[in-house]
């Protein structure tokens, strides 16, 4: 039987500003990537999001990003490897305080936005992130773009690595994500998104924006919680995966 994890970036509200449909999306996923206060989120949001994940029996992961609230962590920054490593440790530590108090563990770490996309190509940045995770707890799973520098470096270091694919994003022919500034970067057609997901899991292929087929490994599917179609996507994905006899389980269970 095919197996896959379903994750979403949640806990990205901030103060009086609400973002996403976390309360609904969390009912359908198996792993939650919780913002740690730098690109989004705040202490109260983190506390509430951890509790929501626990109530819904969803595995918890840290979602560290660049210190860029105004840009939602989607703007590239020039940082040293030492800085990047410290940034990631700091944010994992923030989430750890809430999970420790709640008596649960951090299952995984998935970088956010520009940090994620840059680390997919930049070996030095990927190494800094992977080392931060390893030094905190080598049992934590590192999540990265499938077949990227991030996953390659994590595996070399000895971490358990989850290769991630995206239901609602278009791909370039080199396996990277199409920039959000490019037309067609975000897929709004739920039927198309679901069909692509099933093909990625069963065939290990995804059609790039130029029509080429790209080989891809799919341990975990991401549905963005801030996408206006997130709830429709995740609902339809869960329904279709069941029909296709694809079991949805957490990363930890999948990678054992």
Curated annotation (Swiss-Prot):
A Pfam family found in this protein is LamB_YcsF
Its EC number(s): 3.5.2.9
Q: Which InterPro entries match?
A: Glyco_hydro/deAcase_b/a-brl (IPR011330), LamB/YcsF/PxpA-like (IPR005501)
Q: Which reaction does it catalyse?
A: 5-oxo-L-proline + ATP + 2 H2O = L-glutamate + ADP + phosphate + H(+)
GO molecular function list: 5-oxoprolinase (ATP-hydrolyzing) activity; ATP binding
Q: Which Gene3D superfamilies match?
A: Glycoside hydrolase/deacetylase
Its domain of life reads Bacteria
Sorted alphabetically, the Gene Ontology BP terms of this entry are: carbohydrate metabolic process
Keyword terms, alphabetized:
ATP-binding, Hydrolase, Nucleotide-binding
List, alphabetically, the SUPFAM superfamilies matched.
Glycoside hydrolase/deacetylase
UniProt lists the family membership as follows: Belongs to the LamB/PxpA family.
Q: How does it assemble?
A: Forms a complex composed of PxpA, PxpB and PxpC.
Cited function: Catalyzes the cleavage of 5-oxoproline to form L-glutamate coupled to the hydrolysis of ATP to ADP and inorganic phosphate.
The protein here is known as 5-oxoprolinase subunit A
Species whose genome carries this gene: Alkaliphilus metalliredigens (strain QYMF)
Phylogenetic classification of the source organism: Bacteria, Bacillati, Bacillota, Clostridia, Peptostreptococcales
Q: Which gene is the coding source of this polypeptide chain?
A: pxpA
């Amino acid at each position: 039987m095919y197996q896959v994890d379903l994750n979403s970036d949640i806990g990205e509200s901030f103060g009086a500003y609400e973002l996403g449909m976390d309360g609904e999306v969390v009912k359908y996923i198996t792993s939650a990537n919780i913002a740690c206060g730098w690109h989004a989120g705040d202490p109260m949001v983190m506390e509430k999001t951890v509790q929501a994940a626990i109530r819904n029996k969803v595995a918890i992961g840290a979602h560290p990003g660049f210190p860029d609230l105004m840009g939602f962590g989607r703007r590239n920054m020039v940082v040293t490897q030492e800085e990047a490593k410290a940034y990631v440790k700091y944010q994992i530590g923030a989430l750890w305080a809430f999970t420790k108090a709640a008596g649960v563990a951090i299952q995984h770490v998935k970088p956010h936005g520009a940090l994620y996309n840059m680390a997919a190509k930049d070996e030095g940045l990927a190494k800094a992130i992977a080392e931060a995770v390893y030094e905190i707890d080598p049992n934590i799973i590192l999540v990265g773009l499938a077949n990227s520098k991030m996953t390659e470096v994590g595996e070399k270091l000895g971490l358990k690595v989850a290769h991630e694919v995206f239901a609602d994003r278009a791909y370039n022919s080199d396996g990277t994500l199409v920039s959000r500034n490019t037309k067609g970067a975000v897929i709004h057609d739920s039927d198309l998104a679901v069909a692509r997901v099933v093909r990625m899991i069963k065939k290990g292929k995804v059609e790039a924006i130029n029509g080429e087929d790209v080989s891809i490994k799919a341990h975990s599917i991401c549905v963005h919680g801030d996408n206006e179609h997130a709830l429709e996507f995740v609902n339809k994905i869960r329904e279709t995966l069941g029909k296709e006899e694809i079991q949805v389980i957490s990363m930890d269970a999948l990678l054992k």
